[in-house]
Amino acid sequence: RVLYSWSGKIYAKGQGWLEAQVVSMKELAERFNPSKVMVESNGYQRLVVHAAADLAGLPVVGHNTGREKHRHDVGIPLIALKMEQEKYAIPWNKEATEGSRPGTRKLVDGLSRLIYGKNGRLEGHTPDAVMALWMCELAIHEDHKQKLNYTKWDYFA
C-alpha cells in the first residue's frame, strides 16, 4: 500500500544539499514509519541512498534505473495496467489537488503525458511525480518477491 509519494527539489549549497535531503527523508520516515523507501540512485543520488541508509539508519533502498523502465512487467507501463485493474485510487478533490506536494494534479498530468514511441519505449522526459510512483511500485514488487511462497499439498491415500 502506498501511503505517500514525494518528488521535488531540495535547494541548499554544497554539503547542505545532502544534509537537507536526509533531513527531509527522516521527517517523512517519522511521519509514516515506512518499511521501505525506494529512491532512484542514478549518479549523485547514490550518495543520498548511502547517507540515508548507512549513516541515518533509514530503510532506504536505491534503484539504478535502466532499460527496465520501459518494460511492461516491471516498468512504468505496469502502472497503467494496475490502474486499469483498479489497484490505485487517486484522490481528486480540492484538498488533494491543491494541498498536497507534489499534488495529485501533477501525477495525473504526468501520467497523461507519457508517450510511447513506435519502438515501445517511453519518449522524452518522464515526469518526477511518475518516477516517484514507479519507485513505490518497485518497492512493492520487491517486497512481494521476497515473501515466502509455499504450496500446501494434501495427499489422500
Task: Give names to the regions the model predicted.
Residues 1-114:
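Mg2+-dependent endonuclease catalytic cores in nucleic-acid-processing enzymes, primarily RNase H-like
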Residues 35-39, 119-123, 144:
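Generic amphipathic alpha-helical segments used as scaffolds and interaction surfaces in large
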Residues 83-87, 115, 136, 140-144:
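Conserved NTP-handling cores and scaffolds of large molecular machines
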Residues 110-116, 122-138:
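Charged alpha-helix within mobile-element recombinases
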Residues 134-157:
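Acidic two-metal-ion nuclease catalytic site recognized across multiple nuclease folds
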